[in-house]
């Protein structure tokens, strides 16, 4: 199944980086979850810089919309955000810790 996980780097999402109980979606957890997925389809995780949990509804909307357009309707323009030799999300300086497999 396709998989796209997003989170922010703010304290509510990321936690303090030291306490494993801190944060809703700390980087270690995102990495662990993404690494455990065994899928033949596209899987992506990414964190939006300087955003926190509440902001991700609008800060992540463009990529989430493109993700659904690509995975549900095979929209070729939307696919460019995630596929090809230079996926747009990898070039976007507002995002970090982007992993595509």
Language model features: what each stretch is:
Residues 59-101:
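Catalytic active-site module of serine/aspartate enzymes centered on a nucleophile-bearing elbow/loop
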Residues 1-76:
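Active-site-adjacent alpha-helix of alpha/beta-hydrolase-fold enzymes
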């Amino acid at each position: 199944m396709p998989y796209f996980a997003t989170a922010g780097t703010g304290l509510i999402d990321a936690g303090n980086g030291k306490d494993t109980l801190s944060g809703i979606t700390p980087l270690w957890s995102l990495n662990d979850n993404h690494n455990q997925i065994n899928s033949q389809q596209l899987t992506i995780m990414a964190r939006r810089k300087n955003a926190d949990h509440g902001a991700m509804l609008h800060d992540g909307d463009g990529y989430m919309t493109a993700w659904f357009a690509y995975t549900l309707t095979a929209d070729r323009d939307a696919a460019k955000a995630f596929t090809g030799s230079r996926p747009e999300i990898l070039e976007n300086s507002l995002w970090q810790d982007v992993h595509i497999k």
